[in-house]
Every structure is written in structure tokens, then in C-alpha cells.
């Protein structure tokens, strides 16, 4: 069973999510619904990593940038990390080198891979999920048909 905020998105919002993965991620209800779906599939580490990277890229302070980079690395990248994401060895090594001198782009390659994985794998499953279908069904039931 999925649960998101008690405040539901409008039917129109829910339908927009199927148009593009970016639409889903840009909408707070869409993001919450997608996170709940990923959690139900035991793969929420992907969206959590992606969101951590988005936050990381907005960080201005060099000290905070370094501490956030270490946290992201420890949480998602290093071997046996609690929320280890599924990326190739080469990308992991590149990140390990990149965080020696932290820049806003040190996780870019991994973030792109995770985004692509979610867009091509998790997103289509989300759109076919009972939860999303139920939102769409409610959408159809709320439409007034004029003859």
C-alpha cells in the first residue's frame, strides 16, 4: 500500500506525470508518490541519491560542499554503503577520485546513470502501478462530460 501526504494532487496534475519523467520529479505530489512507489519496491535509494545530488549542486559554502560530498559518498557510493546505489566500478572509482577535491560536478556521472535507470525502469513501472492507475481512474471519474 502506498501512502503520500493526505493532501492529494489534482486529477490534472496526476495525468501530467505520465507525459514526462521531469514532470513527475518537478511536482511535489508526483515526487512523493514516486518515492512511495520506490519504497514499496525496496529501491528508494535511487531517488534519495538523486535528490541528495540535486541538493549538493545548490550548496554554496565550500565547507558544506565537502561535508555533503562525504555524506553522499558514505551513504550511497562506497562498498557496503547503507543505501548503496547500483553503479559500475569505473564510476565509483571516478567519484572516489573526484571527492578528493570536491566540485559541484563530482557526482554528475552517477546521478545521470541513476536518473536514466529510474526513467527507463522505475518510471514505467510506476505509471503501470495500481496506485498511479487509481489516481488516473479518479481523474476520469471527476471529468464532467458535456454532450
Regions found by a protein language model. Give the residues of each.
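Long, compositionally biased intrinsically disordered regulatory segments in eukaryotic proteins
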Residues: 1-147
